[in-house]
Every structure is written in C-alpha cells, then in structure tokens.
Amino acid sequence: MTKEELQERQRWPLHQKVDHTLGVIDQFISRMNGNVYLAYSGGKDSTVLMHLCEILKPDILCTFVNTGCEYPSIVKFVRKMKDEGHNIRIIRPNMRPKDVWEKYGFPLVSKKVSHQINLCRCDLQAGRPLPWYVDDPKSFYKIADKWRYLFHTAYNTNDHCCHVLKKEPQRRLAKKLGLAPIIGVMASESNMREKDYIRQGQCNSFDEECPLKSKSLPLSIWTDDDVWQFVKERNIELADIYSKGIRCTGCVACGYGCQFADDTRLALLYKLYPKLYAHIMNYENNGVTYRQALREMLKVEGMYLPDENPQLSLFDLFDQSEL
C-alpha cells in the first residue's frame, strides 16, 4: 500500500468507514474462531470500538489495565461501563509506575526517540560507536541534535514503561485465555503507526504459526474527527475528562509530546489533580526527579512546567469558562 492509498481511505465518509470496520472485525472474529478480546483503555477511541465490536460479539471481553497512572475519571468511567453490563475485566501490571521509572528511566520526547536514546546510551556505555542511522538525515531513526544531551544525563530515558505497564499485562492475560487482541489505534496518530499500516496494507494481521500473535486494528483508517462524529451521531457516553479539555487519555504524566506548545497534558493534570501531579513529579531515576528531567526537556523548546512558568497563570493556559 502507498501513502496516497491510505489517504484515499482516510477520506472515505464515516458510514463507509463504519461498514469497513465492521467487516474487519467480523473477519477477525471468524478467523480466530471467536477467540478475541478488546484492549480497552477507557478513552474515546476504544469506547467507540467497544460499541462496534459488541454489534458483532455482544459478550466480547474488554480488558482494561489500571496502570496506576490513569486519570481517576477514566478509572471511574470504566467501572461504570462494567457495572452497566459491558464485559470488562480490570487488571493490573506487576510493577508500579514509580518502580518502572526508577528501574528503566523516564518517557521523554517520544516513544521512538526515547527508544533510540536508550539504545545509544547502551552503545556508548559499552564503548561501541553510535549506529549509522542516528546521524543519517534520511533515516526514520535519526535523532535530532537538540535531544542528544539525553545520551549523557544522569537519568535514563526509555520507552519500556508502556511495555511493562500496559502491553505485558494484556499479553499475559491473553495467553492464559487463548485470545488475540483487537486494538483501537489509528494510522493518523503518529508517523510510526502510519508507516506500520502502509507496510501491512490492511487492518488485520494473522500469524498462522502462533495465532495469538494475530491482531486487529479496525480503526486504522479513521481520524479523530471520525471518532467525534461517531460519538455525536450515536450519542456515545464518554468519560467526563473530555469535557474538561483533555484530548488524549493515556498515562497522565507521560512525557511524550509535552514539549509541543499545544500540548496541555501537564497543565491539565496540574489543574485537575494537583496532588497527583506533585506526587508524580517526585518519581526518580538514578536520584534525579521526573520534575528535573521534564524541566530540562521543556527548556530545549523554551517552555516551562505549568507550576514553574513565571509568566503564565492557569487563566492564561485555559479559557476562563473552563475554570
């Protein structure tokens, strides 16, 4: 598949995407003999996908990982959905976020950059030269000069937290139950997901040798606007955190993307859950706090943590109607 072909599918009207998505889910359920589950986050995308999956398999198992780093509003909403009859199982990881960051390092800049930073740090510490692609301007994995200070910091930068806190608990349960995942991600969310979809060429991937490695990404060709349109047209209930300005309901203090001027995740956390914000800012790696690491990352872009900005108040960060 080409990028142009993906973009053509992304321009389909919503009703066509819904039909396509139901076909994708139906094919996956059939090929897997019904042995499937929905990786449920409690966010808008996976809530829309839950409603679509339940059209074809009303009793589909939806697994929610309470990582300990979720918005309280999301956890409350998931429990409400469970109480209302959705087949939701709430599970937990084996480690707390605090312990994961202390052992592996902080999630900074982006998943791709933090992964490459960690690999490069390992090479440098072992006396090996940096991989060629780090400096190749044509390489997808080139690391921008402004982030190379992370090669030498006292604290580690790593993308391992997502694996430990989210993916591993899901996989462990799926292996125990013999189920393959349906996941609510979209190609439009990142360059990496776009490249993955173009390479795959379709929403479903099947592994004949190890069926549990098969997976379905039925919302791949959807956009954020499609999700909101579907929510409005079908009157889908969402967690109330969305009415308070949040756009992404992942881990509350994840450092991925916080360096962008339009990212208000940390400001919202500080505004809505100040005690949780203060608690997470004190997480450590190698004796350095998350606050210190974030402060250094934001400084690269001339930005500040929401409680350290000398020029802004909360009234500057949000519409006064939201406060």
Language-model features and meaning:
Residues 2, 210-212, 224-323:
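ATP/NTP-dependent adenylation/nucleotidyl-transfer catalytic domains that generate, transfer
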Residues 1-226, 233:
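ATP-dependent adenylation/nucleotidyltransferase module used to activate substrates
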